[in-house]
Amino acid sequence: MELRDLQIFQSVADQGSVSSAAKELNYVQSNVTARIKQLENELKTPLFYRHKRGMTLTAEGRKMLVYVNKILQDVDELKQVFLDSETPSGILKIGTVETVSTLPTILSSYYKSYPNVDLSLQAGLTEELIREVLDHQLDGAFISGPIKHPLIEQYDVSTEKLMLVTQNKAFHIEEFTTTPLLVFNQGCGYRSKLERWLKDEGLLPKRIMEFNILETILNSVALGLGITLVPQSAVHHLSKAGKVHCHAIPEKYGSISTVFIRRKDSYMTNSMRSFLKTIEEHHHINML
């Protein structure tokens, strides 16, 4: 078993097909297929189900992937320990929820100060970003928090007001039972706050409509499709233009914190250290 066998296995698992993995790794397909077969023979167990749509992990394959991800992460960190220069460089993979209002300022400042770092930004929901940080797929992420996890180191970044957004100027709480709720998929911090509020009020929403893009939600509210709950900064432009109206909600549910997270046991590269410094320059940031 060689290191490149593990890299091939990881790529096939991530891509879901031999052809996509071969393209990603710049290998010929027959080589990828042979390496996977050789790995299965060596471990005496099938690691993938083969089907028309590609390949998916077996139960043993999923178990294998946990170890492979850890091994390859350790190899990357070993390289970083010896190759990490005083000048920040390399790739920094950062995840973020859509509504971190000062993120463009942070990224712009960081790029100007450290142009040798390639920033890779990925948007997502809080729960999936946490999972990707834990799986070493991201170096860190801005999420709705705070959270409690023994492997997570988190930094308090900011707190924002949450506003109920409607098309009409007036709003009554009973409208939750007659008007669709427009929300992100499960795993969104704003949705969790809204659902907790409705549960405490004993209200059952008429319909929940799920979206993946913030602008789609807000534009749909402006057209009268439904109502939503988002940070005030995210809806300021539409509210100022008179296209939607914002309503305060009870204080218990009316704010949400943004935190930056990373794995506690991950090697602190100069690139990450500099990124945290940049955040600190734009926010009052404390490690929780």
Swiss-Prot record:
GO terms for molecular function: DNA-binding transcription factor activity; transcription cis-regulatory region binding. Residues 18-37 bind DNA. The keyword Transcription applies. InterPro entries: LysR_subst-bd, Tscrpt_reg_HTH_LysR, WH-like_DNA-bd_sf, WH_DNA-bd_sf. Gene3D superfamilies: 3.40.190.290, Winged helix-like DNA-binding domain superfamily/Winged helix DNA-binding domain. Keywords: DNA-binding, Transcription, Transcription regulation. PROSITE patterns: HTH_LYSR. SUPFAM superfamilies: Periplasmic binding protein-like II, Winged helix' DNA-binding domain. Residues 1-58 form the HTH lysR-type domain. CDD domains: PBP2_YofA_SoxR_like. Belongs to the LysR transcriptional regulatory family. PANTHER family: HTH-TYPE TRANSCRIPTIONAL REGULATOR, HTH-TYPE TRANSCRIPTIONAL REGULATOR GLTR. This is HTH-type transcriptional regulator CzcR. It comes from Bacillus cereus (strain ZK / E33L). The gene is czcR.
